[in-house]
Regions:
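Motif-centric detector for short Cys/His coordination patterns
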Residues: 1-83
Length: 83
């Protein structure tokens, strides 16, 4: 079975609450997490040290040992291509 294109292969936290993502299709995209930070579930990400600790587990970006995650489909659909 083919891996869906929206599966995250790598994440590199950037400045200004953005994430540089590489997806299963090999494309790099930039996601701005700023709008999420007002939601109570994502408020811990306001701490820069927490935000910068993003990692990929089973194709999903997570923080705090999986306490916080963002659906990979959302990341793909709401990010912009990076040249």
């Amino acid at each position: 079975m083919k891996t869906p294109v929206w599966v995250v292969k790598s994440v590199v936290p950037q400045e200004n609450d953005t994430l540089l993502l590489t997806f299963a299709d090999g494309k790099k995209r930039l996601y701005d997490a700023t709008p999420l930070l007002d939601c109570p579930a994502f408020q811990p990400l306001r701490d820069d040290s927490v935000f910068k600790a993003a990692k990929v587990e089973r194709g999903v970006v997570v923080w705090l040992d999986g306490e916080i995650d963002i659906a990979p489909e959302h990341l793909y659909e709401n990010s912009v291509p990076v040249q």
